[in-house]
Regions:
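Short Lys/Arg-enriched helix C-cap and helix-to-coil transition segments
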Residues: 41-57
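Major-groove recognition helix of helix-turn-helix-like DNA-binding domains
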Residues: 26-38
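RNase H-like two-metal-ion nuclease catalytic core shared by retroviral integrases
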Residues: 114, 161-162, 169, 185-208, ...
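Acidic/histidine-rich, metal-coordinating catalytic segments
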Residues: 82, 153-167, 195
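C-terminal anion-handling pockets and recognition modules
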Residues: 29, 74-78, 197-238
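A short, amphipathic alpha-helix used for macromolecular contacts
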Residues: 1-25, 72-73
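Extended, low-complexity cationic-aromatic segments
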Residues: 12, 61-146
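RNase H-like polynucleotidyl transferase catalytic core
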Residues: 45, 102-111, 176-196, 212-213
Length: 238
C-alpha cells in the first residue's frame, strides 16, 4: 500500500478506496461508513521502538505466571509500582465553546511548581502512595518501600519498571535484608502498557489538571493527595 499515514485516518481510508476500487469517495462519506462499521477515532497507544516484542511475550507467558505461582505458594500479594509527577502549568481535557472561539486558560508567569508521587496498585485495587518534591533517589525510594512493608499484611511481590534507582546498589542491599517481606520484579524494558499503575497516573493527572491552574505548591499537593485518596476508596475504578 502506498499510503503516507501511520494511522487509519479518514484520509488514509479514502486513499485506500481510491487505490483498490478506483473510486474517489468524499471524506465525509468515508467517515459515515467507518461509523457504520463500528470504527471510532481513537488516540493511539504509544510504544517505543526499543521495545523487544519477544521479551514482552516471554514476560507475559512465563515470568508473570511464575510470579503469580509464587504469590500463591507464599500467600503473598502482587502489586505494581510506578513514579509520576504533575506540574502546576499543565492542563488536560477539553471545554465547549462556540465554533471559531477557542477557549483560553490564563496562566501565571510565576515559577511553576511540581509534585511527584510514587504509587503502588495491587491486583485487588489497593492503592498506596507517597508524595515528594525532590528528584527520585534511592533514599526516597527506600522510604516508600519501608512504608509499603510496614502496612502490608503479607509478603509483597512488587512489579516495577527498570528505572536506574530501582536497580541501584543501595536498593538491592535493602531488598536483600527484607526478602521475606518484599521482592521486586522488573517489567520488560520500554513496556509501560504492561503496568496498570499507568492508568492510575493518568486518572490522577486528569482529575488534578481539570481544575483551575495553581502556582501554589501546597494547593497542588492537596489536590494530588485528595485525588489519590479518592482512588483508595474506589478499588474497582483502576
Amino acid at each position: 500500500l502506498h499510503i503516507d499515514s501511520t494511522l487509519w485516518t479518514r484520509r488514509a481510508v479514502q486513499e485506500l478506496i481510491a487505490q483498490q476500487c478506483g473510486v474517489k469517495m468524499p471524506i465525509r462519506t468515508v467517515g459515515e461508513y467507518l461509523r457504520r462499521w463500528g470504527y471510532t477515532p481513537q488516540k493511539p497507544l504509544k510504544r517505543a521502538y526499543e521495545q523487544d516484542p519477544k521479551a514482552v511475550k516471554h514476560w507475559l507467558e512465563y515470568e508473570y505466571p511464575s510470579i503469580k505461582q509464587r504469590r500463591q505458594e507464599e500467600c503473598g500479594e502482587i502489586a505494581w509500582g510506578d513514579e509520576s509527577g504533575l506540574r502546576s502549568d499543565e492542563h488536560s481535557g477539553r471545554g465547549y465553546a462556540p465554533v471559531g472561539q477557542t477557549p483560553e486558560i490564563h496562566l501565571s508567569h510565576k515559577p511553576r511548581v511540581r509534585v511527584n508521587f510514587i504509587a503502588s496498585l495491587s491486583n485487588q485495587g489497593t492503592v498506596r502512595f507517597m508524595l515528594y518534591t525532590c528528584k527520585l533517589t534511592a533514599k526516597v525510594f527506600i522510604i516508600f518501600l519501608e512504608r509499603l512493608i510496614r502496612k502490608a499484611e503479607r509478603k509483597l511481590f512488587w512489579i516495577v519498571d527498570r528505572h536506574p534507582v530501582h536497580r541501584s546498589e543501595s536498593v538491592k542491599q535493602w531488598l536483600a535484608e527484607h526478602k521475606s517481606e518484599i521482592e521486586l520484579f522488573p517489567l520488560p524494558s520500554y513496556s509501560p502498557e504492561l503496568n496498570p499503575t499507568e492508568y492510575l497516573n493518568c486518572d490522577v493527572k486528569q482529575g488534578v489538571h481539570s481544575k483551575p491552574p495553581t502556582r501554589n505548591l501546597t494547593q497542588l499537593k492537596d489536590r494530588v493527595i485528595s485525588h489519590l485518596r479518592k482512588l483508595q476508596k474506589l478499588p474497582a475504578r483502576i
